Curated annotation (Swiss-Prot):
Family, as annotated: Belongs to the universal ribosomal protein uL23 family.
Organism: Methanococcus vannielii (strain ATCC 35089 / DSM 1224 / JCM 13029 / OCM 148 / SB)
Quaternary structure and interacting proteins, as annotated: Part of the 50S ribosomal subunit. Contacts protein L29.
Recorded name of the encoding gene: rpl23
Name of this chain's protein: Large ribosomal subunit protein uL23
InterPro entries assigned to the protein according to its UniProt record, in alphabetical order: Nucleotide-bd_a/b_plait_sf, Ribosomal_uL23, Ribosomal_uL23-like, Ribosomal_uL23/eL15/eS24_sf, Ribosomal_uL23_CS
Amino acid sequence: MDAFDVIKTPIVSEKTMKLIEEENRLVFYVERKATKEDIKEAIKQLFNAEVAEVNTNITPKGQKKAYIKLKDEYNAGEVAASLGIY
């Protein structure tokens, strides 16, 4: 699966800003069929950042969210800034 097909859009809210600052996490809507391994590879390809863990859930609207924790040597704030959301 192509990295641009896996990652759809970042989620920007007060909650996600708090996750970026305090937990070094990013939150994206992702392709519903994407696995956690697909999401890890897409983040590595698109943002050159190593992923520590990926948690996913499917919203009642049927969209899949991925909560992506970056390894300590990478800063989620810098990745968010490169996206223009922080």
